[in-house]
Each structure stands twice: as C-alpha cells, then as structure tokens.
Amino acid sequence: WLLQRITERHLAYTTVNQAVCALKFFFDIVLGRTAEAITIPYAHTPQRQPEILSREELARLFEAAANLRTRTLLMTAYAAGLRVSEVCALRVADIDSAPDRMCIRVVAGKGGKDRYTLLSPSLLEALRVYWRICKPRDWLFPRTTDAAQPFDISSALRAYYRARDRAGITKTGGIHT
C-alpha cells in the first residue's frame, strides 16, 4: 500500500518517512507487534555527486581570486584536497617540502584526526612564491587584521564565492568540491 502511494503521488522522502514512522508506531505501540514494526524500512535520499570543476574552470577561479593569499589558499585547498577549515588551520611548519616526503600535515581534520596529504610540485612552487612575498610566520594563511590568528573560515568561503562569481562559474557546490 505504501509503495503504491509513493509511486502514484511522487512523494518526497521526508513525507514517506513520516508515514513509515506512523506505521511503526501503529504496529509497535497500538498493536504490540514490535517485530513487524522493525521490518518497515525508511526511505533514503539518493546521494548526489558534486559537480567537479574542470581544469579550465579551476584556472579561471584562481585567476579571479582577489589577491595572492586568496589564490594560494584556494590552490592549496584544491591541490591537496583539504576542507576549508583544514586549509585555514595550516601552519607554515605543516608544509614538508623535503624531496623524499613532499606532504602537508593536517592537524585535527574531520573527526579530530591528524593526517597527511600529498604536496604536488606545482603547489609547492605556488606556496614558495606566496611565502617569499607575504612572509607568513606561524599560520600559513593568517588574518590580515591579526597575524596571530588563522584566516577565518567564513572569510575564506566568501573569498571562494566571490572568485567563483568573478570567474563566471555557474556550477553549484562549495570550496571542498
């Protein structure tokens, strides 16, 4: 009955799950048939893949960045596969450019876990140019108003969306896609 209602009326997953909750309540509490209530499955929303930016779109995005710091921050996020919070929290000491290592240390990433990610030669060159010009001391991307603090996540997101709009990129998604 429920499956027929779903297919006929093209119900949203949340609506379907409300009906499932009502049925589970009815079977479990009203009828006392817990076993039947457990077997009614919930509807799951399909997982959508994010829209990935092409190389040409990435080049336009980096070119549209407001300044060298923002450009290098965006390049680091994309080249190393970092979340915005991770790239903002990078310290100069987290960059290991030794030829036998070439990695970036991510401290307290998703789930509070530390990890290492690859440092490509092209990103290393961009980071060296940035370092020579901006000379960051502790934080790789410090705040402009207070160098003792890391770049603010919301400011990084704003900078990304501004660059995306300036570059004429219409794909949806955030800095992490």
Residues covered by each model-derived region:
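Conserved catalytic core of the tyrosine transesterase superfamily
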Residues: 1-177
